[in-house]
Amino acid sequence: MKNIIKATIVLGAAALLASGCIKETFPTGSTQTKDQVSKQPSAIDGLLNSIPAAMVTTGTAGHLSSYNVHYDFGIGAIHMATEFMLEDIATLGDNPGYNRFYVWCLNQAQGDTYISCAYFWDCYYPWIKACNDVISLIDPETELAQSQSQLGQALAYRASFYLDLARLYIPKENKYIPIPDEIKELTVPIVTEKTSEQDANNNPRAKRSDMYEFILSDLALAEKLLAGKSLGYNTPNLGVVYGLMARAYLEMGADGDEGAYEKAITYADLAISTSGKTPLTQSEWQDPVNGFNNGAANNSWLWGIGCTSENFNNIGCQAAMLCCEGQWGYAPLSQLGLNKATYEKIKDGDFRKASWLDANAQAHAPLAGSAADGKVFLYGNEDLQIPAAKPYESIKFRPAQGNCTNYTVGNAIDAVMMRVEEMWFIKMEALAQSGKLPEATALLKQFMDLRILDGSYSTAKLGDLDSFIDEMFFQKRVEFWGEGILIFDYKRLDKGITRGYEGTNHPLVWAFNCEGRSPQWNIVITRGEYQSNTAIVNNPDPSQFTKNWTGAE
């Protein structure tokens, strides 16, 4: 591995420290600001396009330049960080410090004084600022189709960002760290195109009900503006708006809002019918060229964010961290894979199981690249400093174009934002939670027949709500492994994590377990915000809320 020089990692109860040198190249793309554009639709396009560009650009939060952290690459990094707070991504490499998200794995440095705490905030709020800049330039009563489309997209982006923030930062009860009464039901401050600097300095966290009212108002206007507009998967189109509504109403239903589950069902159906999208086929899922890296190559993705060589460097991007078949970056060294216990529970006839190597480190789906590239992945290469593949290692996310050797090609993967399969699961959960368990069970059976193709999947043992939710949740974990949406399911459904068990393939340094939801999922607000915004009351620091599993329990 010629792009990586050997590093030494010290693993201990108190710290995980990495030292090493990595040669980097830097992106050359640029963005525009509100002051640099006029109110002409053609000029606003550049400002609008800067939003998705910022979402996948190396160094987007300023943490790479300020702190030299290599996980600063935007929405893909946020998705990975949240996945590492869960249980299903195991770091299999001999040196787990090559997983640059180790602070989230360890549940260390999650308090307000740490850069890891600040990362989500330092991504989302600048992106929201870019949305506000576009929104401020367009009259919502405009009759120009291009302007309507631009405003609708900006509103949908903003709603998506606030929906993520609301779900990440709202403190939920757990068995480890009490939630003070003063912060219950609080999300994050709302900043719009009309918020002054003075207002921002005394801007309290919005109550849950107020935040969802704001999000849904943005989406309602976006729905109106985007109706009849033909937009591709790489921007929030009308189907995406309905998908975001379905996500929001599912959360509201879980929080007890009357009628919310029924609306979640309605909007999930609308997202499916409006988009015309269908679940991935086996050939699309296992495609060694386009698998989970190219939304244009399938009929499943409602939304994905494209990435070009202008947006990334050689190691600071999602592919370099996640695509294990690539011969550069951290992925072939951290060797991310599936939790062994989860793998063993997946039925052998489920074609998704081939997303990971088996217990003997053998592949059951085509490998990316040439036959020689496949040998490098499976058996390693001393000259390239690439180790042999590990049991349960991932081949779900392929390098772009199946290119395993050239990072300027292979790193240009799309970030998946929404697949139609999620709408199926939203509908299932909402049906079950609203007292329609037989319909929910039938829908799960219908979906699983698209994954276990011989029709042998059975729901006979799912006769009550709890057993159904457990099974649906497990299948959703398998379906969306690594895609960055599962933290919201864990948090909403009050599910725990199990990394420590006999035979675990998680590094013991972060093999902790928790019963029910983890306090780590109540993200702490960065000190930079509450020092400037006097109205902030923060979430408690969850760092190291429990001890690691030692094998004695």
What does each model-found stretch correspond to?
Residues 151, 158, 165, 245, ...:
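Structural register within alpha-helical repeat arrays
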Residues 1-20:
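Sec-dependent bacterial lipoprotein signal peptides
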Residues 93-169, 206-210, 220-231, 408-415, ...:
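Conserved, well-structured interaction surfaces
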Residues 21-79, 321-337, 342-348, 352-360, ...:
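Membrane-proximal, proline-rich intrinsically disordered regions
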Residues 32-35, 70-75, 169-184, 228-319, ...:
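Short, surface-exposed recognition loops and adjoining beta-strand edges that mediate ligand/DNA contacts
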Residues 348-419:
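Flexible, polar/acidic helix-loop-strand segments at domain edges
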